[in-house]
Amino acid sequence: MSGEPTFHELGARTNFSFLEGAAPAEEMIVFAKKAGLSGLGVADRNSVAGVVRAHAKAKVEDYPFQPGARLVFADATPDILAYPKNRRGWGHLCRLLSVGNLRAKKGDCTLYLADLLEWQEDLLLIVMPGEGRPQPEILEALLEKLKASAGNRLYLGLAPRYDSFDRHDFAVLATVARSLDVRLLATNDALYHDPHYRPLADVVTAIREHVPIASAGFLLQKNAERHLKGPKEMVRLFRDYPEAIVNANKFFKRLSFSLDELSHQYPDENAEGETPAESLRRLVAEGALERYPSGVPEKVTRQIEYELELIHDKKYEPYFLTVHKLVKFARSVNILCQGRGSAANSSVCFCLGITDVDPQKFTLLFDRFLSRDRDEPPDIDVDFEHERREEVIQYIYRTYGKEHAGLTAAVISYRSRSAGREVAKAFGLSEDVQSALVSSVWGWGTSPFTEEQAKGAGLDMADPLTRRVLAYASLLMNFPRHLSQHVGGFVITRDRLDEVVPIMNTAMPDRYMIEWDKDDLDQLKILKVDVLALGMLTCLARAFRFLEVHYGKPKTLAELYEDQQAAVYDMICRADTVGVFQIESRAQMSMLPRLRPREMYDLVIEVAIVRPGPIQGNMVHPYLKRREAQRKGEPVDYPSPELKAVLERTLGVPLFQEQAMQIAITAAGFSPSEADRLRRAMATFKRTGTIHTFERKMIDGMVRNGYEREFAERCFNQIKGFGEYGFPESHAASFASLVYASSWFKAYYPDIFCAALLNSQPMGFYAPAQLVRDAREHGVRILPVDVNHSDWDALLEGEAMFRKEAIDPRHGEMRDVIRSGKAVRLGFRLVKGLRQPDMEALVARRGEGYRSVHDLWLRSGLTRAVLERLADADAFRSIGLDRRRALWAVKALNEQSAVERLPLFDGAGSTDLQVEPAVALPDMAAGEHVIHDYRYLTLSLKAHPVSFMRGDFARMGILSSRDLARTPAGRRVTVAGLVLVRQRPGSANGVIFMTIEDETGVANIIVWEKTFQKYRPQVMGSRLVKVRGRLQSESGVIHVVAEYMEDMTPMLGLLRNEARRFGANDRADEALRPTADARDKKALRQLRPAPPAQEGLETSEAGSAVAEVMPKGRNFH
């Protein structure tokens, strides 16, 4: 074997050379090893985003790997491969890439040769000659300049192009190299690993160049040779230049850097004169006295000491101090925030005020958060108000600077929809076929395309082109498209961050991110803190302000937590939870009447139980069964007193990851660290299968401790059923307090709750239309957007505006509970196309109110386009104009007559200058109003679209959603409504839960997998759908189990047809036989008698136009 050739490939690109490389980094490593390459260097285009993945895979494979980057310049300098010789060289490479990133827009890197000359120390460089014929003069000048700085760290690459010119080109390059004493280096400049991936390389080229493959011509690779080649083949190819092979091997051996050398130090946050450990201990002691004003329990003191010792051993004090500093800042400026996730297992975090869940109350497990034997950094997630989180982010940048703080990247990858569309486009399929193909895909998953989806899109599976499109779309899935900023993961360092990883601009101003995602950071053991945004915290912060300002009742989250009210739980048990945090989905609403929460811990269970883990572990029904038995006074049997202590709070059924760990510790003799490894194996067993390594140890351990083998096996299988979906109790406990707080506001102050929710959009499960409908059903009066009354946000106004008799009978129990007294005035934020600064100017200059459109135009300084949008939104009712007349008045404004806005005319009353058009405009029909409401506001206070079809529906035997409550279970029924929500939980075996809405309320639809496959276009594409099926009722929750579905979207045309029957038209500047103002010549030209309604007008034609403004329905997993 000693005679076998060796070769190290240094020119490999991965799919992190976005739309250039055509193979994942991990597959490149595996293939390189299999091909017999002695080592692999990865050098992606101006990036090191993919090197951690290659590094991690190389460690698993025990394979030599080196990270580098392919430097692509903006000044016509040929590409140069740069590899760090050592840790200092890595820092220089990161600084170099950061320079290019920060001078360019997000996603670009603009480098010049001068940048490389500044940062070339400790970098080994390979000049690549490029795709065309070598240009000796240019290469000589470049090499001379580089050699003066880099010396013997400089090489000239030889890369065959397999185009019959290689012999000539190599000779030219060799002559240049010899003349300058620069060494040649062999590489195949690989774009992918396997030659079979060449067609995929063509696909990504076509996507990158925005041309179909058939038209790409010379943009495509000439052959399939740009793959990883083994040593024998490379030696054969470079037989005339054996020194190039030798130099590649020597080059690789000169590289001593490993990504494992990267160390991360959090900034020193300790007070002057204290070590970080002393500062943390002092802050925890002070916080403990605040958390336990009656004295810190001995058990808590012991736990705090245990945690502090472990934190000290791991040297994590600066990390905790940094997170504490961020939370302290947020609270100092009244930003609502709360830690969650595994950090809620920590008493230290609780005492520091980072989390609000007392681990002692919930019997949480610290080792779930931080373990002595687990060489992994802790992960603290903190939620902030989503509209004010930017203040925290900018505080971080102000405090530490972009050289020391950056957001984590998120790798945006191709999913089924994007891959399907892009590949179909690359193969030249029409836009219609592309849209049909992607519309057959559920959500944003990465499941391969099926034959049914292709047929549904009108594709012929017998056609080889169709099969290629589906095959390459499936291959493209999970390929990275680009880097985006993580939702809030921050890396903060004491040393320069841009010497650890390149930093780059984001699409948002004054934000910077790094090139690695959270998995990369975990792999390298680099700590991050998650500064996350939570819409419900924004909603609650606004609700607390409303409560104090309008009702004189200041409250806090902590006070609500202690104010446990039976009326709130009664409402929850009735599943009256639209808008409530975490329990507003159909699946949660179905569970609430069965679980019937009566205390805070019940909400902890409710949050966690409707999750894939407990469902797949077959834990839901046993838990509900035992809960019902408990209500009847029946005792719960436990296998042992020890396990009773672990499982008593969940009635003997393990629902949480922490319980799985505690069972392993208590019943099987696991150490806390072993139990944590079990938890991690549970989280990844579908991908790695490692949970089985714990099976014998756990079962045998339980048997040794006196448990029956059958019980031990059942217990392990139940834990295994958690899979990767097990829900941590600490996470559920953190969320439960927000569930109760949002429920409290909904129960007692639905006016506040509605306004706060509207002002916190986008968030939650339901659109504003459904939030408004629900508030009205609870007796809240909703007032329309108006130029004289609205603000940007929704407001509360009026006194004694609440009417108990307006409460829908379905919510009659709330009549003596609700304390509301205000009406909700909708805000300008709901109007599509309006800008907040414009509306703030309108409000600021409103004074006593605007008397006319002309008055508003003069005083507000807004453009006519903004006024048109206000008229579109029907916002001029307070001055006596509906949207048609308001639009006409806006059209009559002469934008050129800006002289009327000059100070000279300030003394004149607005009516002196106003000349309203004298025109007889017909009233706009109700259906047309509703269309415009949905077009510009996404909701209507005037009528529900389905109300215009009720007569037709009644003749078709279609029931209203209200009728379902009066229909016996088991009967076959037909319902129809607008599609609001489609939910397809990953644990539901393909079942889809749909929510549809008519003018009387919502109906819940269950679509089994078989039915979904039969009616996929109707489920996925309908905006108005008819469903026939059997009525199912359980614990007060009503569903229709779909058997037949029909797309009724064309019937939405009835709204427009209804308007046309009365001679109404689409635009307000069109009228029947109008008298126009002679000032407006353009308006005169536009005025024409409306054509008579066509006989036999197709409903589908009008329906397709109206459907565009109706909600598409939201898809959730």
UniProtKB/Swiss-Prot annotation:
Q: Which UniProt keywords apply?
A: Cytoplasm, DNA damage, DNA repair, DNA replication, DNA-directed DNA polymerase, Nucleotidyltransferase, Transferase
Region Disordered: list its residue ranges: 1086-1117
Pfam families membership = DNA_pol3_alpha, DNA_pol3_finger, HHH_6, PHP, tRNA_anti-codon
What this protein catalyses is: DNA(n) + a 2'-deoxyribonucleoside 5'-triphosphate = DNA(n+1) + diphosphate
Q: Would you tell me the Gene Ontology cellular component terms?
A: cytoplasm
Q: Give the matching InterPro entries.
A: DNA_pol3_alpha_NTPase_dom, DNA_pol3_finger, DnaE2, DnaE2/DnaE/PolC, DNAPol_HHH, NA-bd_OB_tRNA, PHP_dom, Pol/His_phosphatase_N
Tell me a GO biological process for this protein.
DNA replication
Q: Could you say which EC number(s) this protein's record lists? A: 2.7.7.7
Its chief place of residence is cytoplasm
Which GO terms of the molecular function aspect are on file? 3'-5' exonuclease activity; DNA-directed DNA polymerase activity; nucleic acid binding
* HAMAP family in the cross-refs: DNApol_error_prone
What this chain does, per the record?
A: DNA polymerase involved in damage-induced mutagenesis and translesion synthesis (TLS). It is not the major replicative DNA polymerase.
Report the sequence similarity comment from the record. Answer: Belongs to the DNA polymerase type-C family. DnaE2 subfamily.
What protein name applies here?
Answer: Error-prone DNA polymerase
